[in-house]
C-alpha cells in the first residue's frame, strides 16, 4: 500500500526535482502539495508548484498556498540561487489549473482529518506552514506519522556560517517542529552536500529523452551555475530536497543517527543554527533521525530509474 504524504515546498530547482521523484514513485501517494515562501516569494513558489504539476500531467493533485512570511520575521528569499522565477532555466508550461481557495494549513488539516492512517509530512522549505499546522491543530498530531524535512546541519551553514537557509528563514517555526513530540527526520547539509549531481549525471538524465528528464537536466544546468563557485568545493550541484523523498523510497541509501536537535533563535552569530546533540551531552532524549551520509551513486541511480517513468 502506498505511503500517504503531504508535501510542503518552496520551488526552487531542487524542490521541483523532489516533486518529480515523488510523483514517479508508486510507493508514495501524494495527497496534496502546499507552497511556502522561501526560495522565492510566495506568489512565485505557488505558481511553480502549479507549473510543475502541469508539466507532469498531475493537475488532479490538490494545491494550496501557504504563509506569506515567517512567523516572527521578515521574509528572506534565495533569488541569487534560483533566479527571478524561482525555476529559471527551462521553459516550463503555464499553470493549467488553479490552487484551492483555502490556506495550506486548512488543506493539510483536511487531508489529515480524512486520512484513515497517519500521514507523513515532507517539508523542503522553511517550516512556517508545518509549525502553523501543529500550533493550530493539536488534535491532529496523532495523524502525523513523521515529519521529513530538508534543513539544518551539524555545525556548518550555507546562508550564514552557522545556519542552513531553510532553518535560518524561520528558526522559530523550525523549533516548533523539532520540539513537537512528532518524530522528525532531518536531511541537513551533512548529507545533502554529498548528494551532488555531476555533469555526467545530468547528461545521463538528458539522454533518457523524455520531456520531464529533459526539464530536469535543464534545471540542473541552471543550478550548476551558482554551485560552481569554488568556495563550495563542489564537483557538481547538491540536490538537497530530493534526499527527503529518496529516504522514504530507499532508506538503505542513507546513514542516520538518532539525536536530539534544537534550533537557536536568538544567537548573535548562530541564529538559525540546528544544535545537534551528537555526543548526548544535553540529557535530552533524541527527537530526530539525522541523516549523515548517502550512497551518492545509489541516489543518482534512483533518480535516473524514476525519470524513465515519464517516458
From Swiss-Prot:
Database matches in CDD domains: nuc_hydro_IU_UC_XIUA
InterPro entries with a match to the protein in the record: I/U_nuclsd_hydro_CS, Inosine/uridine_hydrolase_dom, IUNH, Pyrim_hydro_RihA, Ribo_hydro-like
Cellular component terms (Gene Ontology): cytosol
Top-rank taxon, per record: Bacteria
Keyword Transit peptide among UniProt keywords: no
SUPFAM superfamilies noted in UniProt: Nucleoside hydrolase (SSF53590)
Membrane-spanning intervals of the chain: none
Enzyme Commission numbers on file: 3.2.-.-
Record's keyword annotation contains Signal: no
Keywords on record: Glycosidase, Hydrolase
GO biological process, one term: purine nucleoside catabolic process
Catalytic residues (positions): 240
Coiled-coil regions listed in the entry: none
HAMAP family, A to Z: Pyrim_hydro_RihA
Function (record text): Hydrolyzes cytidine or uridine to ribose and cytosine or uracil, respectively.
PANTHER family in the record: INOSINE-URIDINE PREFERRING NUCLEOSIDE HYDROLASE, URIDINE NUCLEOSIDASE
Protein name: Pyrimidine-specific ribonucleoside hydrolase RihA
Organism ancestry: Bacteria, Pseudomonadati, Pseudomonadota, Gammaproteobacteria, Enterobacterales
Amino acid at each position: 500500500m502506498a505511503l500517504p504524504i503531504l508535501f510542503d515546498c518552496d520551488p526552487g530547482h531542487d524542490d521541483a526535482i523532489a516533486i518529480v521523484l515523488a510523483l514517479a514513485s508508486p510507493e508514495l501517494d501524494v495527497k496534496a502539495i502546499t507552497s511556502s515562501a522561501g526560495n522565492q516569494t510566495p506568489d512565485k513558489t505557488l505558481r511553480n508548484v502549479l507549473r510543475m504539476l502541469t508539466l507532469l500531467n498531475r493537475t488532479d493533485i490538490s494545491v494550496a498556498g501557504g504563509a506569506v512570511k515567517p512567523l516572527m520575521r521578515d521574509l528572506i528569499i534565495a533569488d541569487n540561487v534560483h533566479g527571478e522565477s524561482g525555476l529559471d532555466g527551462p521553459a516550463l508550461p503555464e499553470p493549467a489549473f488553479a490552487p484551492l481557495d483555502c490556506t495550506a494549513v486548512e488543506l493539510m488539516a483536511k487531508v489529515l482529518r480524512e486520512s484513515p492512517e497517519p500521514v507523513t509530512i515532507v517539508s523542503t522549505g522553511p517550516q512556517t506552514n508545518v509549525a502553523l499546522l501543529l500550533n493550530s491543530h493539536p488534535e491532529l498530531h496523532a495523524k502525523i506519522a513523521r515529519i521529513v524535512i530538508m534543513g539544518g546541519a551539524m555545525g556548518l551553514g550555507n546562508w550564514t556560517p552557522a545556519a542552513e537557509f531553510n532553518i535560518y528563514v524561520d528558526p522559530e517555526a523550525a523549533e516548533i517542529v523539532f520540539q513537537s513530540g512528532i518524530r522528525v527526520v532531518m536531511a541537513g547539509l551533512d548529507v545533502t552536500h554529498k548528494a551532488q549531481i555531476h555533469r555526467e549525471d545530468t547528461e545521463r538524465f538528458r539522454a533518457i529523452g523524455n520531456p520531464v528528464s529533459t526539464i530536469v537536466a535543464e534545471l540542473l544546468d541552471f543550478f550548476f551555475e551558482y554551485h560552481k563557485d569554488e568556495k563550495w568545493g563542489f564537483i557538481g550541484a547538491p540536490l538537497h530536497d530530493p534526499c527527503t523523498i529518496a529516504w522514504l523510497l530507499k532508506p538503505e541509501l542513507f546513514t542516520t543517527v538518532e539525536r536530539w536537535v534544537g534550533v537557536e533563535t536568538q544567537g548573535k552569530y548562530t541564529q538559525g543554527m540546528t544544535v545537534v546533540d551528537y555526543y548526548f551531552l544535553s540529557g535530552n532524549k533524541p527527537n530526530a533521525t539525522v541523516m549523515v551520509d548517502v550512497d551518492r551513486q545509489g541516489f543518482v541511480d534512483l533518480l535516473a530509474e524514476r525519470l524513465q517513468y515519464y517516458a
